[in-house]
C-alpha cells in the first residue's frame, strides 16, 4: 500500500502537501492509507 498526504489550502490559495506540514509540525499529521 502507498501513503498519500492530505492536502490543505493556505491563505494565499496555494495548496501544500502533508509532507511539507510534517517538516513544520512533526508528527501531527493525518495520512490516507491506499491499498
Swiss-Prot record:
The keyword Electron transport applies. Residues 4-35 form the Flavodoxin-like domain. Its cofactor is FMN. Keywords: Electron transport, Flavoprotein, FMN, Transport. GO terms for molecular function: electron transfer activity; FMN binding. This is Flavodoxin. Belongs to the flavodoxin family. Low-potential electron donor to a number of redox enzymes. The keyword NAD does not apply. Disulfide bonds: none annotated. InterPro entries: Flavodoxin/NO_synth, Flavodoxin_CS, Flavoprotein-like_sf.
